[in-house]
């Protein structure tokens, strides 16, 4: 089940914070940042739940005409089951931007499969280890 978080979803926010530390290590969002994304008018978080457990999540910044994916992740035991795809499909209503570590080939291939195109590189964007970010964009045809 996919759910859009509200500030009352304290347990899910805590789960996301813990997953962020496990998955993204030093580049993880803080608990406060995660809570702020839920509270703000221009951002939101979707979670994919199985038996009240967060198995995947999508953090999005909602600009007027585009979305920016801040984070998308699936826990290890739930990978390759289409969870990230279902989460991404929820926001394919306007153009989407994201950045991804250049070494994260699995994610890059996932994005390419979803019609994201590389548009730029940010040199040295990530730390621990220092690494370039690939900026990607998916355009939605609203004809």
Where are these regions (language model features)?
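Conserved active-site tyrosine of GNAT-family acetyltransferases
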Residues: 20, 111, 116, 136
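C-terminal "cap" of GNAT-fold acetyltransferases
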Residues: 101-105, 124-143
């Amino acid at each position: 089940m996919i759910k859009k978080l509200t500030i009352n979803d304290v347990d899910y926010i805590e789960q996301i914070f813990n997953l962020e530390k496990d998955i993204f290590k030093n580049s993880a969002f803080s608990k406060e940042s995660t809570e702020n994304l839920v509270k703000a008018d221009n951002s939101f978080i979707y979670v994919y739940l199985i038996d009240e457990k967060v198995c995947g999540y999508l953090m999005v910044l909602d600009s007027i005409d585009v979305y920016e994916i801040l984070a998308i992740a699936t826990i290890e035991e739930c990978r390759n089951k289409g969870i990230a795809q279902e989460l991404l499909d929820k926001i394919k209503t306007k153009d989407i931007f994201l950045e991804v570590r250049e070494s994260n080939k699995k994610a890059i291939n996932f994005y390419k499969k979803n019609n994201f195109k590389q548009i730029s590189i940010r040199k040295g964007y990530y730390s621990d280890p220092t690494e370039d970010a690939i900026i990607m964009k998916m355009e939605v045809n609203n004809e």
